[in-house]
Amino acid sequence: MFDRIALISIPVKDQKAAKKFYTEKLGCTLIEEMPFGTPDTLWIRLALPRADTELVLVTWFPQMKPGSVQGVVLTTKNLADTHAKLKARKLDISDIKKQPWGLEATFRDPDGNGWVLQQSK
């Protein structure tokens, strides 16, 4: 019935600042950036490394306040390596914690949206 989750809307205050964070800190690739609706609003679509699901940095959903997205899980086969690379990019990321399902670390974007980086057992 469904193929996949194509896009996840990430609510942000400042689209340009958020784009810089997601591309420089997380290594996302800019797919497209164009005017959207009002002159101050952009359609910014990003690709996560090696993922099918894309991110859209949104400001136009009043019910989605910046920082309201929590618990989006990114997976990796080698959390220690990924964690070290993100720390080298000056990402404020938690220490790696052992959980019943594997290893995980958490971080937030500048708007407070919460992410989980996970390595399964």
Model region roles, listed by residue range:
Residues 2, 9-52:
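Core segments of cupin and vicinal oxygen chelate
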Residues 51-55, 112-115:
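Short, charged/polar, Gly/Pro-enriched secondary-structure boundary elements
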